[in-house]
Structure formats: C-alpha cells, structure tokens
Amino acid sequence: HFMSDTKWLLQHGFKEIEKLPNGFSLLVMSFHENSAVPYFNDCVKSGECPDKLGIVAYYSNRCPYTDYYVNGVLRVLAQERNIPLKVIKLETREQAQNSPTPATIFSLFYNGKFVTTDLSICTESKFTKLLK
C-alpha cells in the first residue's frame, strides 16, 4: 500500500488547496501563475458512496493484486458473513472521475461510508476488525 508522504511534499513546495473530511488532501505545485487550479470533483466530497447497505469496493487495474483480492478474497469473506458486496471496477477515465473516491486503485465503503484505500482490508483479520 503506497500513499505519498504529505509532510515531505509540503516541505518541497507543494500547497494543500483542498482537504476532504475523510483525510484526502489535494496538493499542488504550480509552475505558472495562470495555471488552472485543480479541485476535487463534487462526487468525492461527502466521503460516502450511493450504496448504503453492506460493502462496496471500487477498484481499477492500476495494481496487479487488486483484482485477486477484491474478486477472490473479499467476495469469500463477505459471503461467509452474509454481507452484501458490490464490486465496481473502474475501467474508464470517466468512471474514475465520477466515482465517490479520489483513490481509484482501491477504495472500500461500508454501509455507505468510506473506510480505507488499504487493500490489506481484504485479509481475514483486518476484515473482521472492520466489522466490529
């Protein structure tokens, strides 16, 4: 699981221009004064997904392990516990840009709320902790 170190980026000239309640920050290093300022799409700002029952996993093929863990391990864990599971594979730029998460490699929601981008949630021990 890899996420950039925010402190390091801020020390090297990046500026935080937007922060979401679920912890995501949008950092920018502008090279031109008149550059367009990036922003989070409205669909990610609530930290929730449209499906409010059970587990929803959004993922893409950007990590070679994600498909195995989402469609193999996570499906089994959810089935064993009779938890509804919806898997949404993001296959186009438009799907990624309109998903409820800025982290499109893998994001997991439980009962509509964002939980994690950490793929290790698909292991039995971490999955069990999620449900407590």
Regions found by a protein language model. Name each.
Residues 1-22:
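Conserved active-site alpha-helix within GNAT-family acetyltransferase domains
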Residues 19, 28-32, 79-81, 98-99:
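Non-catalytic substrate-recognition and accessory regions of acyl/acetyltransferase enzymes
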Residues 22-45:
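C-terminal "cap" of GNAT-fold acetyltransferases
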Residues 23-24, 93-97:
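A short acidic, often aromatic-flanked loop/helix-cap motif at beta-alpha or helix-coil junctions
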Residues 42-80:
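Local sequence-structure signature of Cys/Sec-based thiol-disulfide redox active-site neighborhoods
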Residues 82-95:
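Thiol-based oxidoreductase modules, predominantly thioredoxin-like and allied folds used
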Residues 100-109:
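Structural micro-motif
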Residues 110-132:
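Non-catalytic, surface beta->alpha helical segment in thiol-disulfide oxidoreductase systems
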